[in-house]
Amino acid sequence: KSTIMNMLSKSEVFAENKLFATLDTTVRKVTIENLPFLLSDTVGFIRKLPHHLVESFKSTLDEVREADLLIHVVDISHPNFEEQYEVVEQTINELLTKQTEVQESQPWVKKRKGDNGKGKTEKTVAQLPRIVVFNKIDAFTYTPKEEDDLTPIKRENISLEEMQRTWMAKLHDDCIFISAREKMNIDELKSLFYNRIKSIHIQRYPYNDFL
């Protein structure tokens, strides 16, 4: 995540291939073509979060709740990347649901106006538009099966091209496959960001001629 932020914002956010290299939410201003926006780099998501990192994780949750667009970065070179993807989605849903339930139980919490004028505390993760970025395609490896091999196909037997077709068909959200380190498909990534953010901007400010 931090590598992608550094590349887009031309800043120097600490990036390391280890859990919790980012412990605080970092925000940078990014401009793609003529469109400026704020990009937040948050702490990574894992199952069974260590107690001493709970506060950092709460700050991440705050960023997710207030975001207009969620960028879910997945390390596709990891052998268990599909499980990691599901863990992140499940964790965000659980945390947002729990936080909303707590807030709704507190009568002094100021509620936002939702549909039909009813009180609505926070947006749910399902309402957040998102882009799934499969990173590290340069490190993706697989082992083709022999023609006479009748054993079931495993994850390590699936090529990157097959993986792309599968995930593009599976996800309702936009997804893209890149290598931040090798600068592969970065122009496509920027274009995708630009189009999605521009669409959000137009919906919010329909009479703004800025774009």
Regions found by a protein language model. Give the residues of each.
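Generic enzyme active-site microenvironment
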Residues: 39, 73, 133
